[in-house]
Amino acid sequence: MKQYAIQPANLEFNAEGTPVSRDFDDVYFSNDNGLEETRYVFLGGNQLEERFPLHPRPLFVVAESGFGTGLNFLTLWQAFSQFRDAHPEATLQRLHFISFEKFPLTQADLALAHQHWPELAPWAQQLHAQWPLPLAGCHRLILDDGRVTLDLWFGDINELTGKLDESLNQKVDAWFLDGFAPAKNPDMWTQNLFSTMARLARPGGTLATFTSAGFVRRGLQEAGFTMQKRKGFGRKREMLCGVMAHALTFPSPTPWFTRSGSAKRDVAIIGGGIASALLSLALLRRGWQVTLYCSDEQPAQGASGNRQGALYPLLSKHDAAINLFFPSAFTFARRLYDALPVTFDHDWCGVTQLGWDEKSQHKIDQMLSLALPDALAVAVDPDQAQQETGVATHCRGITYPAGGWLCPAQLTAALLALAATQGLRRHYTHTLTALSRQATGWQLQFAEGKAVEHEVVVLANGHQINHVDQTRPLPVYSVAGQVSHIPTTPALSALRQVLCYDGYLTPQNPATHQHCIGASYHRGSEETAYREDDQQQNRQRLIDCFPDAAWAKEVDISEKAARCGVRCATRDHLPMVGNVPDYDATLAQYAALARQKDAAERAPVYPDLFMLGALGSRGLCSAPLCAEILAAQMSEEPIPMDADTLAALNPNRLWVRKLLKGKAVK
C-alpha cells in the first residue's frame, strides 16, 4: 500500500439519471428499480429480515465487495433502523458494514446518485457528511449515534485482501458479493477474493450475489461455501446464495503480532487525558462497564492539559507505517471531533508547516512527494504561505487545510462528562502503583492505600504508563516540554493558521486573546516546573527561523505565563496500542525466532491487560483512531487498520523486530 492517493470513479449519468462507469461500461445500479433489486438480492438472499431478531450477538457484521454508490449499504441501514425501532429489546444492537472500493465516487457524484432514492435521504445525508478523502486504506465512519459503523477500504480488493489483519477472520455474518458484472470487470471476480470471503465468514455466515455465473459458483464452493441457486430479480433468471456450513482454520502468518481481545466486559482505565476519555466512550458504545482511575484531582492535568494543541498528521518519506497511519488517524479525528455533542474551543483554520532552512525544505519536499490529496496536504510557495497564514515568513511549505487547533483540556473534560452520562464511573486522586493477576481478573493497588479488582485493565496514563512491573521494560521515554502563553498584538493577531517551524505558534484564541508558542523538549525528563530558559528559547526559535519577520519579534514572554507537561514517546514516532506484552516470556519464547519463524507460536501477553500510550506530540491526531482500534480489539470486533500498520502499533514491535533479525534485545 505504497500508493496513498486513490483515483476517483470516472463516471457519467445516463438519460435516466443512473450513474454509468466509463471505465467498465456498466451501470452502478439497475435503471428499472435498483432499490428493490438490492432488497431482493442482498437482504433477501442473506435472509436478514428473518435473522436480525434471532441474532445471538449485539453486533451483526456485513461485508461487501464493491461499495459503488452505497445503495446496498443505505438500504441495509434503513432496514436495520426499522428493525431496531420494531425490536428495541433484541440482542442485536449494532450494525457493522465493511466494504471495498477501488474507485470511490466523489462527494458530489455520490450526492447526485442518491437523488434517485429520496426515501433513503435521512441515511444518505449522514453518509455525505462523513464521506472520506480518496486515500488508500481503511476509513471508519461512526454513524447513527454509534449504532452503525462503516469501514470503507479504498483500493483494489484483490490487493487489500492480502493486507487484512487476521483479527477479521470469521467475523462476517453476511457477504454482499457485488460489483460490475464479471464480463465487464473480470479482474475482481477471482479465486483469491472467494477464498478471502470464506476466511472472513463466520461459521453459519451467508452470501448472496446477483450473478449465477458458473465459475463464480464453483469458485465459492472450492473456497468452502455451500452454494445454491435462487430465482433472480426481475428479468434475471437466477442468482446465487451460499452458506459457510463449517469452521475453517487458517494459520497465522505473523503469530508474534497476533492480537487478542476479551470475553469480559468490566474494565478499569488508568489515566485522565484525551486517550482515556476517547477510549471510555468507545467502550461504553460497545456495552462495557467502564471505571476510570486518575492520579490527579481532575482530568487533563498531564499532556492533555494544554490550552491550544495543533491537529495535523505526521508524514515521513521513508516510513510506510507513518504515512498510512497518520493520514487515516487525522481524517478519522476530524470526523469524530466534528460529530461530538460537546463544546470546546477550536478552530479548523488550517496548519502550515514551513521550510525555514535547507534541511527542513528538503523534508517538506519529501512529504509532498507522497502526492496526497490536496484537501489533505498541498504545497504553498512563500506568497501562498503568506496568503494562507496571514503573516510573511518568506518560506515555502506544506499546508494541511483541514487542520487547526483545539483546546485539549476542555475537550478531555467534556468527553469525560459525556461518558459519565453513559455510565462511566470516575475516581480521581488514585495513583496506580501495582497490578497483580487474580483468578477473576486484576487487582489494582493505589498509592493512597486502596485496592480494587476489575476483570480487564487498560493503561492509558501517559508518561506513567511504565510505572508498574508489567510495563516497566517497554521501550518508551518521557519528554518534558514547556508551552508559553503570550498576549496577542495587532501584528500577531493577523496570524490565521497554526504555524509550524522549529516549534509552533497558534493563532490567538478569541476566548483568551492569547497565543500558544512552543514547545521545549527535554527527553528523559518528567520535570514540570517553570523554566525561564525554555520561555526564552520558545521565543528565540521563532525569531531564528524567521529573522526578517518583524511580527515575530513582538512575542512577549515577560509575564512568565506557561504550562509544562510531560508526554510519552517512542523511537519510531508511533503509538503503542494493544495487549501488554510479557517481556521475559517474549525473550524466552522467541530466543530462536530468526531461525524458527515457521514454528513460532502466538506472542506471550498478559491476559486482559491492554495499553494505549506513547502518543508523543501528535496525540490529538492519533488518540481517536487508537482508541477505536483498541476498543474494537478488546471487543473482538473488526479493527479499522491493515495488518502491517497494526503490527507497527503493537507494543512488542521493537523487541520482535530485533528477535526476527537474530539480534539481542537490551
From Swiss-Prot:
Q: Which reaction does it catalyse?
A: 5-aminomethyl-2-thiouridine(34) in tRNA + S-adenosyl-L-methionine = 5-methylaminomethyl-2-thiouridine(34) in tRNA + S-adenosyl-L-homocysteine + H(+)
- Any matching Pfam family: Methyltransf_30
Key word Chloroplast present in the record? no
Whether Chloroplast counts among this entry's keywords is no
Cofactor needs: FAD
Q: Which Gene3D superfamilies does this one have? A: D-Amino Acid Oxidase, subunit A, domain 2 (3.30.9.10), FAD/NAD(P)-binding domain (3.50.50.60), Vaccinia Virus protein VP39 (3.40.50.150)
Instruction: Identify the EC number(s).
Output: 2.1.1.61, 1.5.-.-
Identify the stretch(es) annotated as tRNA (mnm(5)s(2)U34)-methyltransferase: 1-245
- InterPro entries named in the record: FAD-dep_OxRdtase, FAD/NAD-bd_sf, MnmC-like_methylTransf, SAM-dependent_MTases_sf, tRNA_MAMT_biosynth_bifunc_MnmC, tRNA_MNMC2, tRNA_S-uridine_synth_MnmC_C
Main localization of the protein? cytoplasm
A cellular component annotation (GO) from this entry: cytoplasm
Task: Could you list this entry's UniProt keywords, alphabetically sorted.
Answer: Cytoplasm, FAD, Flavoprotein, Methyltransferase, Multifunctional enzyme, Oxidoreductase, S-adenosyl-L-methionine, Transferase, tRNA processing
List, in alphabetical order, the GO biological process terms annotated in this UniProt record. Answer: methylation; tRNA wobble uridine modification
Q: Could you tell me which residues belong to the region FAD-dependent cmnm(5)s(2)U34 oxidoreductase? A: 270-666
Localization per Swiss-Prot or TrEMBL:
Cytoplasm
Q: What does this protein do?
A: Catalyzes the last two steps in the biosynthesis of 5-methylaminomethyl-2-thiouridine (mnm(5)s(2)U) at the wobble position (U34) in tRNA. Catalyzes the FAD-dependent demodification of cmnm(5)s(2)U34 to nm(5)s(2)U34, followed by the transfer of a methyl group from S-adenosyl-L-methionine to nm(5)s(2)U34, to form mnm(5)s(2)U34.
**Record's family?**
In the N-terminal section; belongs to the methyltransferase superfamily. tRNA (mnm(5)s(2)U34)-methyltransferase family.
User: What is the name listed in the Swiss-Prot or TrEMBL entry for this protein?
Assistant: tRNA 5-methylaminomethyl-2-thiouridine biosynthesis bifunctional protein MnmC
Species the sequence originates in: Citrobacter koseri (strain ATCC BAA-895 / CDC 4225-83 / SGSC4696)
